[in-house]
């Protein structure tokens, strides 16, 4: 066992000799990851973790409600998959491989979005979730009644604009 040394410049615990040699090897690998792809990408091909940037002439949305039914979709027709339930990394990788976007379902109580601070926090959480899960945007699905010219009406308009601005800024090409 090493003795404690209080004075002097000698190290008490020697540094591992191999660690410094690995750093120069790992850095180019990390830098070679495509934009938007991180080391924790669940896809076999890391490029599939990048956001989809193409803009189709028309949109065909599919609303995925779980299970593995997506394996039977006609992927030649689909441009966007909206996830209504649990995130499925296998679905995200497959959709991106087929050229389709995968987006969050955004639903929030209208009474809560009147508060601008709450709205900003909710949007930030959605952006963070989308980025963490390599998703391509959000589909706002608010099905609550909103009276014309009510505070909720203007808050909903603000929510759409602020969400769009935030997603477009944080995830290039997002919906």
Curated annotation (Swiss-Prot):
Location, primary (coarse class): other
Keywords, comma-separated and alphabetical: Glycoprotein, Glycosidase, Hydrolase, Lysosome, Signal
GO terms assigned for molecular function: chitinase activity
Glycosylation sites: 115
Annotated compartments: Lysosome
Domain of life: Eukaryota
Catalytic residues identified in the record: 143
Tagged with keyword Cell cycle: no
GO cellular component, one term: lysosome
UniProt keyword annotation of Metal-binding present: no
Enzyme category, top tier: hydrolase
EC number(s) recorded for this UniProt protein: 3.2.1.-
InterPro entries, alphabetized: GH18_Domain-Containing, Glyco_hydro18_cat, Glyco_hydro_18_chit_AS, Glycoside_hydrolase_SF
Gene Ontology terms describing biological process: chitin catabolic process; oligosaccharide catabolic process
Domain GH18, chain residue ranges per copy: 39-175
Signal peptide as annotated in the record: 1-38
Described purpose of this protein according to its UniProt entry: Involved in the degradation of asparagine-linked glycoproteins. Hydrolyze of N-acetyl-beta-D-glucosamine (1-4)N-acetylglucosamine chitobiose core from the reducing end of the bond, it requires prior cleavage by glycosylasparaginase.
Similarity comment: family membership: Belongs to the glycosyl hydrolase 18 family.
Record protein name field: Di-N-acetylchitobiase
Organism: Bos taurus (Bovine)
Lineage: Eukaryota, Metazoa, Chordata, Craniata, Vertebrata
GN (gene name): CTBS
């Amino acid at each position: 066992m090493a003795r404690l040394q209080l004075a002097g410049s000698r190290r008490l615990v020697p540094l591992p000799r191999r660690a410094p040699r690995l750093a120069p090897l790992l850095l180019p690998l990390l830098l070679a990851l495509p934009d938007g792809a991180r080391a924790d990408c669940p896809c076999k091909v890391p490029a599939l973790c990048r956001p989809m940037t193409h803009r189709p002439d028309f949109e065909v949305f599919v609303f995925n409600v779980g299970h593995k039914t997506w394996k039977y979709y006609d992927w030649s027709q689909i441009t966007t998959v909206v996830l209504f339930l649990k995130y499925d990394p296998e679905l995200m990788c497959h959709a991106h491989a087929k050229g389709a976007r995968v987006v969050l379902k955004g639903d929030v109580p209208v009474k809560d979005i009147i508060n601008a601070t709450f709205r900003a926090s909710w949007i930030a959480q959605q952006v963070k979730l989308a980025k963490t899960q390599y998703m391509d945007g959000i589909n706002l699905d608010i099905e609550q009644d909103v009276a014309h010219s009510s505070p909720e009406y203007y808050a909903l308009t603000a929510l759409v604009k602020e969400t769009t601005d935030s997603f477009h800024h944080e995830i290039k090409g997002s919906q």
